Amino acid sequence: GVYTFSKLMGGAMGGFFTVGGGSLLFLLVAGVIAGNFGPTQGIDTIYQSLLEQGQIVWGLVLFILHNALSGATIGMLGTFFTILFLNQFVGVAAPLSFYLLLTRLLTGFPIAENSIYWPSSWFSAVHTGSTVYQVFGEKALATLILCGVMCLLGIPVMRRRLRHA
């Protein structure tokens, strides 16, 4: 169980730091170098409200962390699929394939595409909410739940595989 948990957490942390670092680099290049950020420009999400209030650093930090949580979900999902299937290429393709499958399956359901319940909110997009802190809290909770479910499902699969190896 500890091996599987650490493997899954490694995937989540890899995704967290990769996407978080990429978001930071993007914001540095777009904002600092190109000069595209001001109090009324930049990221077109609910985090924009913090920029408009003058809390630019806090708004950008929460935006980067929001994206990094998406990366954690994507990284753990890829690692989870490498536990289910003994093929590293499945782990690389799984997050996008899973996202496309969920989006296709949920198309007819009455779920708003900008809500936390829509799959793109789990993997990439910033969903809507009444406050910045509600949106960030929902994203953190969704990431915690999705990663927890993957850990709970992955541990017995890996135990069974190691017993029969």
At which residue positions do the language-model features occur?
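Transmembrane helix segments
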Residues: 82-117
